[in-house]
Design a protein with these regions (language model features):
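Active-site flanking residues adjacent to catalytic metal/cofactor-binding acidic residues
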Residues: 3-5
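Metal-dependent phosphoester-hydrolase catalytic domains
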Residues: 8-89
Length: 89
């Protein structure tokens, strides 16, 4: 499992990364046989894709991936949200 703040959206418009960075990460994921269930998830900024990701082995059965807003009573705790991937065990 490889996860964290990659500073790179991997689909849609990329507001912080680069095309070269996106290509390098995509190539590495393929070479490492990792899938990216968080690829299509949004971020704390409406209309933006996540730059935080969780990659898992392609052989894992991913049930779902979702974003948990990092806020309490409308107050942001971080500029990044939390991301979760559920797998079948």
């Amino acid at each position: 499992v490889w996860g964290g703040d990659w500073n790179q959206a991997l689909e849609g418009t990329d507001y912080v990364g680069t095309r070269a960075g996106r290509a390098a990460i995509t190539d590495l994921l393929e070479a490492s046989r990792l899938s990216l269930p968080t690829r299509s998830l949004g971020s704390a900024t409406p209309g933006h894709r996540s730059i935080d990701h969780i990659a898992v082995p392609m052989t894992w059965d991913v049930l779902a991936a979702w974003r948990i807003p990092a806020e309490v009573r409308g107050r942001r705790l971080s500029d990044h949200d939390a991301y979760v991937v559920s797998i079948k065990d």
